Amino acid sequence: MERVKMINVQRLLEAAEFLERRERECEHGYASSFPSMPSPRLQHSKPPRRLSRAQKHSSGSSNTSTANRSTHNELEKNRRAHLRLCLERLKVLIPLGPDCTRHTTLGLLNKAKAHIKKLEEAERKSQHQLENLEREQRFLKWRLEQLQGPQEMERIRMDSIGSTISSDRSDSEREEIEVDVESTEFSHGEVDNISTTSISDIDDHSSLPSIGSDEGYSSASVKLSFTS
């Protein structure tokens, strides 16, 4: 029974060797000249099978490495193109001297680094100056508020004094007008008194000639009536 099993196993091994040999012949493209009976060296089929798998793996690895190499080349090409574009833009942004006609990548990067440091220093100075100006503006605003307080009070006080002076002046002018009116009335009174006094004097004067003669009396009467 065990012998039959060994024979079956041997036949399976021979069939496997035959199939592998056919596969190798198809891969290399030529017919095999081996005899149909296996040789004693080919009775063990596992090492050739391992070699076949290694060859398949090596061929697959070769294809994969070729694909990876082409991908890497494409990426490297794109990277170089992007780097060239960035360098061209950097030439536009960096102030270069007129004598510099040809620039290396290292020299261009060094100039860009120096230019960036210069811009950072200028930005720090501008920020410091801006802070000083803001501080000075706040101080001046506070000082203006301090000065506007007393000035506003002084202005209100001067306005009140000016209004008081103007009111006093108007009162004095009003009193002067009243005094002028009273003086004017008094002048009229004096005129009346003077008229009365003159009339009385005329009467007294006319009474004297009336004592002496009738002609004098009549003339005095005429004068009195004319004066009236």
UniProtKB/Swiss-Prot annotation:
Residues 173-183 have a biased composition (Acidic residues). Keywords: Disease variant, DNA-binding, Nucleus, Proto-oncogene, Repressor, Transcription, Transcription regulation. High levels found in the brain, heart and lung while lower levels are seen in the liver, kidney and skeletal muscle. InterPro entries: bHLH_dom, HLH_DNA-bd_sf. The keyword Repressor applies. GO terms for cellular component: chromatin; cytosol; nucleolus; nucleoplasm; nucleus; RNA polymerase II transcription regulator complex. It is found in: Nucleus. Residues 43-56 have a biased composition (Basic residues). Its main location: nucleus. Pfam families: HLH (PF00010). GO terms for molecular function: DNA-binding transcription factor activity, RNA polymerase II-specific; protein dimerization activity; RNA polymerase II cis-regulatory region sequence-specific DNA binding. SMART domains: HLH (SM00353). Residues 29-76, 161-228 are annotated as: Disordered. Residues 57-70, 216-228 have a biased composition (Polar residues). Transcriptional repressor. MXI1 binds with MAX to form a sequence-specific DNA-binding protein complex which recognizes the core sequence 5'-CAC[GA]TG-3'. MXI1 thus antagonizes MYC transcriptional activity by competing for MAX. Interacts with SMC3. Efficient DNA binding requires dimerization with another bHLH protein. Binds DNA as a heterodimer with MAX. Interacts with RNF17. It is linked to Prostate cancer: A malignancy originating in tissues of the prostate. Most prostate cancers are adenocarcinomas that develop in the acini of the prostatic ducts. Other rare histopathologic types of prostate cancer that occur in approximately 5% of patients include small cell carcinoma, mucinous carcinoma, prostatic ductal carcinoma, transitional cell carcinoma, squamous cell carcinoma, basal cell carcinoma, adenoid cystic carcinoma (basaloid), signet-ring cell carcinoma and neuroendocrine carcinoma. This is Max-interacting protein 1. It comes from Homo sapiens (Human). The gene is MXI1.
